């Protein structure tokens, strides 16, 4: 519009997208639970499973079951807990107007992100395993997490990656629900289902047949630890046809011991001695016993099954009953006795055995026993054995003579019965080397007083070279079974040995090493255990290779039938002898797994059945002459002999500090326990890979076709579920027979490395590979075989016979698919009733399908990216290809067309298929493309989609009409048809130019241009939230071929469009079909398409297998967590060593109480990664626990052991070894460094790795500077990386070469990955830099098997889009979170903070670390201020809390702010907004860079923050409680990208682009990636943000702009009470001239100053017409009404006086010049088509009309207003108008049809505020508060297809005043009359005389209205008689205006901003 009468015009343009909260994406997910074979196992175990489901997925009945609490304990069997999580609230997003100049506006296209609203349910399923063992096959879903659930109950749709399973015992406490970023836990639903067990035949035969019937465990090991009291049945596995009976032996576990209070000593009776002997017999003897109701057979668990399968003729089944008596061991109680010397143990009361008598029914067939079951049982309870433990400190020990061993009964774990000796257990050697005579006591200790006391069986009685006894350190408290393996041979001392060397010659017991609790103990014969009932053990391997690791935990347990193969004969107990004689018969001993006395069996190596393992003592050989040297580990026949060490053991001192490691054999500790030998052991093995090097090239072998000539070029990669990969050189490869088939045995060797086989430890590490199998032709169990076969014959028929892993096949960067040629055959994913999947596709499976058939196939966890058109199954299908029952889940990202299944389907059909996941194409291109949830482009008469669905989130950026996006298909043309299908999810399309919709983007056939050949839709539904698109189709035209289309009312379907130079967002009702309520959607989907996804078989790769310590000697059940923690401290040591040190941990230690996640070496406060370089300087160890607490211990290097650095851990007595072997890394670094340093950032090689073309700039990566820095420090980085990566157990050229090869082949990706992490993670927590933790310590959160090298390479390969700086939050989630064992970036940052700064809040840490200048201005209202201090809540104004909120759009700001290299950015945080700007926005010649600029910016930032605070304090005070709560939100404020320099004059005007070198742009605004559209406006709003353009945030005019733009962001939902804008009123109506603050304090407008504080001392005080200080004037809504009401007292009075002067003093023609009339006109709204919104039109008066104006009332009745400031013309709706303070609008013009015009609406709104207040007067008038009332009265309009109530002026008048006034004219007359009635009470006032020339200071005083009327008459006449120029300005040219201003100012000051009225006796 034109500028009238000097009015200062400020233009504002609409830029709001009104997007509210949206429904959550509803997804389907299917799970399975696979059961295993029966087991002879009576222990009860509960499996617990957690999973999530959205609240929207719950039925109303299910919601009623919600329990608002957390689950507590494991209760019944097979239950499910659905734990409910609610998504935190999200901001509504909207597009709002511009504010600024009147110049032509640029078109703005603002994208709005749709927020997902949902509630998650985390489900828990519990399975009790009683009498049966269940094998759980874990379905790998989502990003790879395993879920274990039953196929029923609720489906979980969101965040399935959180699904977790646990194995707990009944009564155990359930885990707490996880904390999930952005979600809040609210309760749970419990559900139960009994899981049946399947019996699985065991058809495998052992490789070596024993001479007697052996015992083989039928138990199929589940993925959880059995309870210690598990009863194991042992049976041989024989061929199916065999019917030979099997003998069954079962070992029952005795009770564990525990400590009790001390009691007095009691004498042992001979009866007790007998009981003790029997007790010891029980510790070894295998009692024959049958589990209750457990049937055992020869080959199957049920003989009848063999008959049914045709394997046997049906025999006669007979049974007989026998009585079996079983001894029950007694418990042992330990009591402390302060009168006994510390370490002394004596028996107070011997235990008595109990017994159990069972009647067993034995079934037989053909006289051969096939099974047994228990008929009845009776039990006699045992009596406990009480042992006293001394606690009195021992000072001196005198030598005692050796007389013999203590125990005359069988030891725990022994195979032979020792000779019975007198009670004296030990011989102490004097300084003369002669044995002293010891009194007849069980164990004697001589105190410093010469008194004898009972001495424990301690090996640590040390005698010095002077013959004087050494001090004995106190024993660590041991709460396990004291009665363990004891020394059998006397200790002898010679003079030749030095001090502190205890020489002892114990019987060398078998090596005590751990047994897997899940496996039975077998004898030393070749037995194949059946751990996997689904397939033979040799097939239980990964898809990449068939490897059977030679460990019992890996299903094979293969041991040579030759007892001397790999091991020597089992060590035998020796008779002790009392001389120094050399033992001629000394033999080596096998290191045999010690079976706890409570579990398992112990066998010899002979093939005979060991029914009675206790052999007579006379059968044993003696070995008394052998002496073990503790310090050297040497075994010598003479005391001075020196030989290589045999065994090593580290035995810490008993005072809690570790000693130097003593390389000893199995020594005996002070409490009589046998010390384990320290060895290396690879635990938790999950996969084994064989590699070889040929001519410098490395390849993996999944099979072998022969024995290699040279095994030196081979090595093994051992993968673990808990620890890093270990590379071991191959020592030998031999051919053997296994199960009748030839296989290759691979033996890998490393120093001290042993492997557990058949409950024994043998040297080295072995496993098996198949002979190269014939190529699979039809049924495939290998993905590589499938790909190879199809590529060779693309027309064949192929079946999946197992789920396949696409990781088997490596594709080059330029390869578009796995199968290159066009496939014309059949691919079927189902075989024998089982459905299989292909997992982990990185590219489309096929390039093209032509006439092919693909059915019953699932593609799981696809992660496909490509430049061109891509689909998961194929890029294109043509010529009648049929795709049926194909289901895909995962992520696809492309730069062109993308389809969940196919990019294009030409004359091809898809039926009963689905896609679930994300599709991303935000690439900006002008090329045509099509994106669809199932198919990008569906074309052709025979092309169809039927009975299918897509659950999809699509991110797109269409900017052309030939770019289409659809929930099911993008483009559907040439008669293609979609029917009986639906889509659900979200489509976020940034721009509005493409064709986008929830079902199909576009139906028109561009090829023919004919309507009849367009695509067709029948019976389809859209449950998709769409930004910039429609619900059903993206384009509507007449004659569309659509029928029965439906959409959800709950969906948010919005378009952002340009209207009248304004960007507006409007809900789309075009192509919505039949709109259904949310409650109808679920049933409609089921009606359209009841598609159920199949349950598919998981990958066959081994799952996680935790180390089991329960069968290790000295295991204590209450220390299970301790052992798990010590395992992390000693990652490569054997289980016996771990148990040993675990038993040293005190109960008050955190290692005892909490789960340890990781251990990090440090040098002071710096993290150490390069262990080799810092081996001896490391001095601290940080222990990080699962609650993210931490503690530090002093660390002291001790020695190297088997290429491991070994450290003492403080004074704990514990050891620590890093999770890395020591090897030569320098040679690797030296070889790869030159090639890495040659790389150039702008090179083609880098671009190829990023996947971009040469024309794409690398700017938005913001990595160029860092790339150079990274190359400078590359040598150190590589050393750290290699130190943190895979362990090289032997320093071998082949394994080193493999690493060299990997680095060279991936050098670009590695360097990009390093550069990325060094750029964005270079910040500190206190003194600790987190960069090294992120790069080199991915195990910090407990995921110990992550490879840092692979992680960096994969990050570098992840592509340009993933490495964009703006995607840093998603990049962490996609590429790093799973590798770190974390969930998301912000939880990771918080967890780091908890570890390193536990007493600092996230926000305080953030502020201390960022170089941005941050101002957080809290409210002056106390209750608000208190809330704003609540960290982590929606109320917090902490910057970190706000930008990490799930509702914040720019969470990617965190890392750029943390890594700012200099102070270049400021941040302002207040109640409702968060502002960001650059210092250089204010840089100029007046404020040059440096202190001047910094001080200016920071001072004004603080002042701006206070203004913004004051503005929302004002609104908080006047709003009701409900609306106040909505003020706590975060609206983005951005200063323009306009930066000055030291020469800039005034404001900077040039826009900086993303490639600007300005530090604020390069380090913050650019990386955040918000491409702000710049224009010539003052500012503009986008619903979720405000962007300052010509105005600047920190200036005063920026404050006024703030009130304008924040009105646009606040009016509908907050200021207007949530009722929304009244239909027809544009957004500018509510800002300028209504709710926005005035531009200047002197503005003569009816407005409210809500933001600026003025002062009486201001230079502008004389002209101020607005409130002085809003923070003081407005304390509540009543104050606001009081102010406006009293102001209108004056306004009405002056308007009345002016009106009287005009009607009484002016002529007709003078009236025509002084007045105008206002009318309404109605124009059809171009957006919604309605014609009920008034446009105000101001017109000149005719002479006839002027003649009618002869009274004041006539001015109201004839709709008159002043001509002084209201020019003739149309006042268009949604304009920038203000109501003039001194130019009367007498009219009360209302809209007879509906909504008022912009002038009348603003004026009446303020009059209602004066009369009724804000909430009861103004809000009802300008909002849709009465919409429902209008609807009930039949006053409706149609808005975008919806019937809406039409609020009319008449309805508002009636409702607001309760019918008091019949017309608005009557109301206004009453308002004037109310003031006229007070004229007699007018207060005297003195004002500046406006008639005096400036600078005259003359004043005038009036005492009554008559005096004022006289002055008004003069002024009116003067204006009427004076000339009216074209540049007329009332401020200068109008006497009336100047008089009114003077009077108004005087009363404003006199009433103290209208705190009182101008009338007496009126407030």
From Swiss-Prot:
Keywords: Cell wall, Hydrolase, Membrane, Metal-binding, Metalloprotease, Peptidoglycan-anchor, Protease, Repeat, Secreted, Signal, Transmembrane, Transmembrane helix, Zinc. It is a multi-pass membrane protein; Peptidoglycan-anchor. The keyword Protease applies. Residues 253-305, 402-681 are annotated as: Disordered. GO terms for biological process: proteolysis. Pfam families: G5, Glug, Gram_pos_anchor, Peptidase_M26_C, Peptidase_M26_N, YSIRK_signal. Zn(2+) binds at residues 1604, 1608, 1628. One of its GO terms (cellular component) is extracellular region. Zinc metalloproteinase which cleaves human immunoglobulin A1 (IgA1) in the hinge region. This is Immunoglobulin A1 protease. It comes from Streptococcus pneumoniae (strain ATCC BAA-255 / R6).
């Amino acid at each position: 519009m034109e500028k009238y009468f000097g009015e200062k015009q400020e233009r504002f343009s609409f830029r709001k997208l009104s997007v509210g909260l949206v429904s959550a994406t509803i997804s389907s997910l299917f799970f399975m639970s696979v059961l295993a074979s029966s087991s002879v196992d009576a222990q009860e175990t509960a499996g617990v499973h957690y999973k999530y489901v959205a609240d929207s997925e719950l039925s109303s009945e299910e919601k009623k079951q919600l329990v608002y609490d957390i689950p507590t304990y494991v209760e019944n069997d097979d239950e499910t807990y659905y734990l409910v999580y609610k998504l935190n609230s999200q901001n509504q997003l909207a597009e709002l107007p511009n504010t600024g100049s009147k110049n032509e506006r640029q078109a703005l296209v603002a994208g709005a992100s749709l927020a997902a609203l949902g509630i998650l349910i985390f489900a828990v399923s519990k399975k009790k395993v009683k009498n049966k063992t269940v094998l759980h096959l874990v379905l790998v879903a989502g990003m790879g997490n395993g879920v274990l659930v039953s196929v029923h109950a609720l489906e979980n749709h969101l965040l399935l990656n959180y699904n977790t399973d646990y194995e707990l015992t009944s009564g155990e406490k359930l885990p707490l629900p996880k904390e999930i970023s952005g979600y809040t836990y609210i309760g749970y639903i419990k559900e139960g289902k009994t899981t049946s067990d399947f019996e699985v035949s065991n058809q495998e035969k052992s490789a070596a047949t024993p001479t007697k019937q052996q015992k083989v465990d039928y138990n199929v090991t589940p993925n959880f630890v059995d309870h210690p009291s598990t009863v194991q049945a042992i049976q041989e596995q024989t061929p199916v046809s065999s019917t030979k009976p099997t003998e069954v032996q079962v070992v029952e576990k005795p009770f564990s011991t525990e400590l009790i209070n001390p009691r007095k000593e009691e004498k042992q009776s001979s009866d007790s001695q007998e009981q003790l002997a029997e007790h010891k017999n029980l510790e070894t003897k295998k009692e024959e016993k049958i589990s209750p109701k457990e049937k055992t057979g020869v080959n199957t668990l049920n003989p009848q099954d063999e008959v049914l399968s045709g394997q046997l003729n049906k025999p006669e089944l007979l049974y007989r009953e026998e009585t079996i008596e079983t001894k029950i061991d007694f418990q042992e109680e330990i009591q402390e006795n302060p009168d006994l010397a510390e370490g002394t143990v004596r028996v107070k009361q011997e235990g008595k055995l109990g017994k159990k008598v069972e009647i067993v029914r034995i079934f037989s067939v053909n006289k051969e026993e096939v099974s047994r079951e228990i008929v009845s049982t009776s039990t006699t309870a045992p009596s406990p054995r009480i042992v006293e433990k001394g606690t009195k400190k021992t000072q001196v020990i005198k030598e005692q003579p050796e007389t013999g061993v203590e125990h005359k009964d069988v030891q725990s774990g022994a195979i032979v019965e020792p000779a019975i000796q007198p009670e004296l257990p030990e011989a102490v050697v004097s300084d003369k080397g002669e044995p002293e005579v010891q009194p007849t006591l069980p164990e004697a200790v001589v105190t410093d007083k010469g008194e004898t006391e009972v001495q424990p069986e301690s090996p640590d009685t040390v005698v010095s070279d002077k013959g004087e006894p050494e001090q004995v350190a106190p024993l660590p408290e041991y709460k396990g079974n004291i009665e363990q393996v004891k020394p059998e041979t006397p200790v002898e001392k010679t003079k030749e040995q030095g001090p502190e060397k205890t020489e002892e010659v114990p019987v060398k017991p078998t090596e005590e090493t751990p047994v897997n609790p899940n496996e039975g103990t077998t004898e030393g014969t070749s037995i194949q255990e059946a751990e996997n009932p689904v397939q033979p053990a040799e097939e239980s391997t990964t898809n990449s290779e068939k490897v059977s690791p030679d460990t019992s935990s890996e299903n094979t347990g293969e041991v040579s039938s030759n007892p001397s193969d790999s091991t020597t004969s089992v060590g035998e107990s020796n008779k002790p002898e009392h001389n120094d004689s050399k033992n001629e018969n000394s033999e080596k001993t096998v290191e045999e797994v010690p079976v706890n006395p409570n579990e398992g069996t112990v066998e010899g190596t002979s093939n005979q059945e060991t029914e009675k393992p206790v052999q007579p003592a006379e059968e044993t050989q003696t070995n008394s002459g052998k002496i073990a040297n503790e310090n050297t580990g040497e075994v010598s026949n003479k005391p001075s002999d020196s030989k290589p060490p045999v065994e090593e053991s580290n035995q810490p001192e008993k005072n809690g500090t570790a000693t130097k490691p003593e390389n000893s054999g199995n020594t005996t500790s002070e409490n009589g326990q046998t010390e384990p030998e320290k060895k290396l052991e690879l635990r938790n093995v999950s996969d084994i890979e064989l590699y070889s090097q040929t001519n410098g090239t490395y390849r993996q072998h999944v099979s072998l076709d022969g024995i290699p000539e040279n095994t030196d070029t081979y090595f093994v990669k051992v993968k673990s579920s808990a620890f890093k990969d270990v590379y071991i050189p191959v020592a030998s490869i031999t051919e053997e027979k296994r199960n009748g088939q030839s296989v290759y045995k691979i033996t890998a060797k490393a120093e001290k490395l042993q492997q557990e086989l058949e409950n024994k430890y043998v040297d080295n590490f072995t496993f098996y590979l198949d002979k190269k199998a014939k190529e699979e032709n039809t049924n495939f169990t290998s993905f590589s075989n499938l790909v190879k076969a199809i590529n060779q014959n693309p027309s064949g028929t192929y079946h999946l016979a197992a789920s396949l892993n696409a990781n088997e096949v490596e594709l080059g960067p330029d390869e578009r698919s796995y199968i290159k040629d066009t496939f014309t055959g059949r691919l079927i994913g189902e075989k024998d009733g089982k459905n299989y999947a292909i997992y982990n596709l990185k590219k489309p499976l096929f390039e093209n399908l032509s006439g092919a058939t693909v059915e019953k196939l699932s593609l799981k966890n696809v992660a496909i990216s490509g430049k061109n058109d891509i689909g998961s199954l194929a890029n294109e299908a043509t010529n009648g290809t049929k795709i049926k029952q194909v289901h895909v889940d995962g992520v696809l990202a492309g730069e062109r067309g993308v389809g969940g299944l196919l990019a294009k389907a030409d004359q091809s059909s898809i039926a009963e298929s689905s896609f679930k996941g994300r599709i991303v194409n935000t690439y900006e291109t002008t090329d045509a493309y099509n994106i669809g949830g199932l198919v990008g482009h569906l074309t052709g008469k025979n092309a169809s989609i039927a009975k299918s669905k897509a659950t999809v989130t699509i991110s797109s950026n269409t900017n052309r009409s030939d770019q289409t996006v659809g929930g099911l298909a993008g483009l559907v043309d040439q008669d293609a048809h979609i029917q009986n299908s639906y889509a659900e999810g979200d489509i976020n399309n940034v721009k509005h130019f493409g064709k986008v919709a929830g079902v199909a983007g576009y139906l028109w056939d561009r090829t023919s241009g004919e309507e009849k050949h367009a695509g067709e839709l029948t019976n389809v539904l859209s449950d998709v939230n769409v930004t910039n698109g429609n619900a059903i189709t993206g384009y509507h035209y007449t004659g569309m071929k659509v029928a029965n289309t439906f959409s959800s009312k709950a969906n948010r379907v919005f378009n952002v469009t340009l209207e009248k130079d304004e960007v507006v967002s409007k809900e789309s009702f075009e192509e919505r079909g039949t709109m259904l309520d949310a409650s109808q959607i679920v049933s409609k989907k089921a009606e359209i398409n009841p598609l159920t996804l199949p349950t598919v078989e998981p990958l066959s790769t081994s799952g996680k297998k935790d180390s089991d310590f329960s069968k290790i000697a000295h295991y204590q059940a209450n220390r299970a967590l301790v052992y798990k923690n010590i395992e992390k401290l000693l990652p490569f040591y054997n289980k016996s060593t771990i148990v040993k040190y675990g038993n040293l941990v005190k109960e008050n230690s955190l290692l005892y109480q909490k789960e340890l996640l990781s251990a990090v070496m440090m040098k002071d406060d710096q993290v150490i990664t390069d262990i080799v370089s810092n081996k001896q300087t490391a001095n601290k160890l940080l222990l990080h626990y699962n609650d993210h607490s931490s503690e530090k211990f002093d660390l002291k290097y001790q020695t190297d052991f088997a290429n491991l650095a070994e450290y003492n851990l403080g004074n704990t007595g514990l050891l620590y070894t890093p999770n890395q072997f020591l090897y030569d890394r320098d040679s690797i670094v030296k070889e790869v460094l030159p090639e890495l340093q040659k790389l150039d950032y702008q090179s083609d090689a880098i671009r190829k790795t990023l996947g971009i073309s040469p024309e794409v700039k690398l700017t938005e990566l913001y990595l160029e500077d860092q790339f150079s820095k990274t190359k400078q420090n590359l040598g150190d980085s590589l050393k750290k990386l290699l130190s943190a990566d895979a362990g090289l157990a032997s320093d071998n050229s082949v394994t080193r070469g493999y690493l060299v090869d990997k680095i060279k082949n991936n050098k670009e990706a590695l360097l990009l990955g390093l550069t990325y992490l060094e750029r964005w993670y270079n910040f500190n927590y206190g003194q600790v830099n987190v960069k090294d933790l992120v790069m080199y310590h991915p195990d910090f959160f407990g995921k110990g098997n992550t490879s840092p090298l692979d992680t960096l390479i994969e990050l570098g390969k992840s592509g340009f889009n993933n490495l964009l700086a703006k995607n840093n939050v998603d990049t962490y989630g996609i590429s790093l979170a799973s590798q770190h064992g974390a969930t998301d970036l912000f939880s990771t940052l918080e967890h780091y903070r908890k570890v390193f700064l536990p007493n600092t809040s996230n926000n305080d840490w953030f502020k201390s670390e960022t170089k941005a200048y941050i101002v957080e201005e809290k409210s002056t209202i106390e209750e608000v201020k208190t809330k704003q201090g609540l960290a982590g809540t929606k109320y917090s104004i902490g910057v970190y809390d706000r930008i990490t909120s799930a509702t914040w759009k720019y969470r990617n700001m965190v890392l750029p702010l943390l890594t700012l290299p200099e102070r270049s950015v400021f941040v302002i945080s207040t109640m409702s907004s968060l502002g960001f700007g650059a210092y250089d926005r204010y840089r100029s010649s007046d404020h040059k860079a440096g202190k001047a600029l910094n001080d200016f910016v920071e001072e004004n930032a603080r002042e701006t923050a206070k203004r913004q605070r004051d503005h929302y304090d004002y609104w908080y005070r006047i709003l009701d409680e409900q609306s106040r709560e909505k003020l706590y939100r975060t609206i983005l404020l951005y200063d323009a990208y306009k930066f000055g320099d030291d020469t800039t004059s005034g404001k900077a005007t040039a826009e900086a682009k993303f490639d600007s070198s300005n530090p604020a742009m390069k380090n913050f605004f650019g990386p955040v990636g918000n491409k702000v559209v710049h224009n010539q406006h003052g500012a503009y709003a986008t619903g979720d943000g405000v962007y300052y353009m010509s105005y600047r945030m920190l200036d005063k005019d920026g404050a006024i702009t703030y009130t304008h733009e924040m009105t646009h962001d606040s009016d509908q939902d907050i200021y207007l009470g949530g009722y929304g804008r009244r239909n027809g009123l544009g957004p500018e109506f509510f800002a300028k001239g209504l709710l926005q603050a005035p531009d200047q304090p002197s503005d003569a407008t009816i407005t409210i100053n809500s933001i600026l504080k003025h002062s009486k001392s201001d230079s502008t005080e004389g002209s101020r017409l607005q409130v002085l200080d809003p923070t003081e004037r407005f304390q509540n809504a009543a104050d606001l009404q009081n102010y406006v009401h009293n102001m209108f007292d004056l306004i009405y009075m002056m308007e009345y006086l002016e009106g009287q002067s005009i009607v009484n003093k002016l002529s007709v023609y003078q009236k025509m010049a002084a007045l105008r009339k206002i009318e309404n006109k109605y124009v059809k709204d171009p957006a919604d088509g309605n014609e009920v919104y008034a446009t105000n039109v101001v017109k000149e008066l005719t002479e006839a009309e002027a003649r009618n104006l002869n009274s004041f009332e006539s001015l109201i009745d004839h709709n008159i207003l002043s001509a002084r400031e209201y020019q003739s013309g149309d006042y268009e709706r949604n304009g920038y108008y203000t109501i003039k303070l001194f130019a009367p609008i007498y009219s009360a013009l209302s809209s007879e049809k509906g909504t008022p015009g912009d002038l009348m609406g603003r004026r009446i709104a303020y009059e209602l505020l004066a009369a009724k207040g804000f909430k009861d007067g103004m809000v009802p008038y300008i909002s849709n508060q009465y919409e429902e009332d209008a609807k009930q009265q039949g006053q409706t309009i149609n808005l975008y297809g919806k019937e809406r109530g039409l609020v009319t002026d008449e309805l508002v008048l009636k409702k607001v005043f309760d019918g008091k006034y019949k017309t608005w004219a009557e109301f206004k007359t009453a308002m004037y009359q109310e003031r006229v009635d007070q004229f007699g009470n007018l207060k005297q006032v003195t004002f500046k005389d406006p008639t005096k020339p400036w600078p005259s200071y003359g004043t005038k005083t009036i005492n009554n209205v008559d005096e004022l009327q006289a002055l008004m008459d003069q002024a009116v006449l003067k204006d009427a008689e004076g000339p009216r120029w074209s540049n007329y300005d009332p401020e200068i040219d109008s006497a009336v205006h100047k008089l009114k201003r003077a009077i108004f100012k005087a009363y404003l000051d006199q009433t103290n901003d209208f705190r009182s009225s101008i009338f007496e006796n009126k407030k």
